[in-house]
């Protein structure tokens, strides 16, 4: 799911009418769900780039059929290792440094919850929010997210660029962190 969420950051460079997923299969409902997430998460991108005729019906086609013998065949990975269930009980709070995460941390503290903060690419505001909440460093999960340099170079050359559904990236990556931590 995280890869599917990150996909749109790269798709927006060319707005290809077809997306071909080779890492597994997706059913029709799943394809429709991803298409809906991408389309509705790209409103600012469409506006900034003057894309006025965008309609979900002709937005993109997603193909996701795993070839015979490939990983993810029919969504099954019989030899895949199972991730351990989280060893730390409590609540994982994504922290972006704004009022939403600050209020959430404060309310959970008052409720006596075991709190873990989750930060993507820590910076001043996120670190200050965690500090203000009184969380120790061992209660903070920090991850680094980088974008491909080729994509950034294409953006510099004038290829399409703009906002993508970052909240979805936070949601899916925090689920992975919660499961593994």
Residue ranges of each PLM-predicted region?
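RNA-binding accessory domains that recognize and position tRNA/RNA substrates
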Residues: 1-90, 102, 107-147, 159, ...
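Conserved adenosine/adenylate-binding substructure
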Residues: 153-181
């Amino acid at each position: 799911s995280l890869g599917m969420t990150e996909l749109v950051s790269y798709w927006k460079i060319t707005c290809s009418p077809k997306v071909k997923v080779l890492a597994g299969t997706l059913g029709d409902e799943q394809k429709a769900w991803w298409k809906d997430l991408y389309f509705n998460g790209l409103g600012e991108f469409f506006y900034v780039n003057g894309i006025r005729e965008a309609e979900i019906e002709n937005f993109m086609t997603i193909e996701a059929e795993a070839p015979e013998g490939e990983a993810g065949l029919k969504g099954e990975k019989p030899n895949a290792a199972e991730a351990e269930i989280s060893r730390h009980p409590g609540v994982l709070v994504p922290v972006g440094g704004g009022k939403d995460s600050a209020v959430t941390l404060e309310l959970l503290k008052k409720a006596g919850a075991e709190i873990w903060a989750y930060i993507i690419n820590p910076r001043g505001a996120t670190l200050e929010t965690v500090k203000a909440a009184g969380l120790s460093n061992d209660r903070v999960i920090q991850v680094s997210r980088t974008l491909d340099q080729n994509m950034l170079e294409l953006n510099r050359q004038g290829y399409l660029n703009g906002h993508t559904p970052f909240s979805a990236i936070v949601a899916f990556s925090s689920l992975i962190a919660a499961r593994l931590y």
